[in-house]
Amino acid sequence: MFLTYVGESGITGATATDPSQPHQVYTGLFVHESQSISMNGEFNALCRRHFGAPLGEEGAPSEIRPVDVYQGLGYFASWPRLKRNELIQDCLGIMVRRETPVITSYINKQEFAAAKAAGDSPFVMMWDSPTGPVINKFFFALSMFLDELNMSTLSGDQIMDGGMPIANHALVVAQTGASMKSEFMPEFLRSDEGIDATGLIDDICFVDPEHSVVNQLSNLCAYFVRRWLQNPERDHPYFDGLRDNKVIQVIYPVTI
């Protein structure tokens, strides 16, 4: 079984047309249950090295928020850029060394708002906010990834027979207080796109990001994907490193 840790970015803007956050991004970091303990241990060792203590203890932040560590805000306001870069690289290195796969979905919130105002798109009119369609696309990307993973384990005879035993399935681990809600998954499974995903996605559970280091890593991925989407012509070494090292594997846009 895979634990799929959900990260998100671009949901704190003032409005759906906030120019500073034109995209809303969700990432799913796939961690096989056999790797979960080692990733947590490596992250805790990283925190001791950078902060002198695990997250949440005296002298350390409660969690690593991407915008804070990247821009030098909050706990990291006194940290020079080089020191912050080293922390980011060490965090991303946990995923790069394992080639931990990440699937991504995103929506252009400004395009959604314009289509909603025009009222001529039946697809857009189904949703009250951009969160619904982009999470629906996220679950679709998740099911497609698992489907391809299961197909890769089949022999030629099994494929010809038309049978596909489900060897790989996922438990979705989302963040308490974030935009992912429990009702989104059954809505997807009842849709035309999700009807074949029932056996692939076990359930969805919610954890406080302060208590889930892998959700924090997934948030970092979502943040750097969003920065790349906003200015794709600029250099984005963190995003490029994740993509070139087979961490960020698929990116699904919501087409409006």
Regions found by a protein language model. Name each.
Residues M1-I256:
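Phosphate-ester processing/binding pockets and catalytic centers
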